[in-house]
């Protein structure tokens, strides 16, 4: 996935901090910046940001990673958009947290648990 951002330096600081609990590795390229998270990858680059927000979800290996993501993302300048907890309206084991990034995108960490 690639996401346009208004300010790549500000977004880099946010995503490096927010995704640290996932063991993120940063990959730089001439066209943008990548974040490698095991078998997931995520790219940002400066560009026109769409009106409204995009919803991005990262699969966490456990609840502790979801909790750590929420703390790290808020510390990195994100805005709380849903504290860690169960979301049974999705399914019984859906444990997630939500934070708005510097461009207003809804960033989620989710652990699916047993369902």
Q: Whereabouts are the PLM-identified features?
A:
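Core segments of cupin and vicinal oxygen chelate
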Residues: 2-41
